[in-house]
Amino acid sequence: MDNFEQVLNALQQGEVIAYPTEGVFGVGCDPDNPDAIQKLLDLKQRPVEKGLILIAASYEQLLPYIDESQLTPEQLATVHATWPGPYTWIMPASDKVSNWVSGQFDSIAVRVTDHPLVQKMCNAFGKPLTSTSANLSGLPPCMTTEEVEQQLGDKLVAILRGETSGRDKPSEIRDAKTSQILRQG
């Protein structure tokens, strides 16, 4: 059953949603809503200092959140060559980004997804979503809708039904300034 509109409505109302990504299920919310982010951090038992990933349908959706002026054309070309896809890049954060999203850093983790359902959700919402793996602290990330329902069902308003893209691990994380791999994908 397609529950896209129900999940979009929950997102617009400031709720935390779960959704399939390239490798695992993610949980996320409106990156510009501190109350929604607090719900997400509480659900994950995640400290605000760690920061969150933003996942978007297009690079244009990320532009308000990053400071491109701190990156060279070559650095940007390296980033763009990997998107859309399962690559998360650490980029300089713009002044718009609250520390609810960036945590203790002056940078922000961003990804342009190639997952069709997440692209559709970001396009319908009109901006990126925060993204972190769907799991309780200490447990492995959820890979299916059923696993999300078992682990987090009583804590979530809406789960976007769908399949992951088949990767068996979270996205690779790299630093846009150095290309250093921070998390193997």
UniProtKB/Swiss-Prot annotation:
The reaction(s) this protein catalyses: L-threonine + hydrogencarbonate + ATP = L-threonylcarbamoyladenylate + diphosphate + H2O
Keyword set, alphabetical order: ATP-binding, Cytoplasm, Nucleotide-binding, Nucleotidyltransferase, Transferase, tRNA processing
Family matches, as HAMAP family: TsaC
Lineage: Bacteria, Pseudomonadati, Pseudomonadota, Gammaproteobacteria, Vibrionales
Protein name (record): Threonylcarbamoyl-AMP synthase
UniProt similarity note: Belongs to the SUA5 family. TsaC subfamily.
Function according to Swiss-Prot or TrEMBL: Required for the formation of a threonylcarbamoyl group on adenosine at position 37 (t(6)A37) in tRNAs that read codons beginning with adenine. Catalyzes the conversion of L-threonine, HCO(3)(-)/CO(2) and ATP to give threonylcarbamoyl-AMP (TC-AMP) as the acyladenylate intermediate, with the release of diphosphate.
Database matches in NCBIfam families: L-threonylcarbamoyladenylate synthase
GO molecular function, one term: double-stranded RNA binding
